UniProtKB/Swiss-Prot annotation:
This is Truncated non-structural protein of 4.9 kDa. It comes from the Viruses. The lineage of its organism: Viruses, Riboviria, Orthornavirae, Pisuviricota, Pisoniviricetes. Belongs to the coronaviruses ns4.9 protein family. It holds the Pfam family Corona_NS1.
């Protein structure tokens, strides 16, 4: 969970690259 939140904060450009953002969140989990 912590890693998910960290990536969430480090990737505010998820609007420009939603697929990349999703990958970063799913991988740690």
């Amino acid at each position: 969970m912590k890693i998910k939140f960290v990536f969430d904060l480090l990737t505010p450009d998820d609007i420009l690259h939603p697929s990349n953002h999703v990958n970063l969140i799913i991988r740690p989990i």
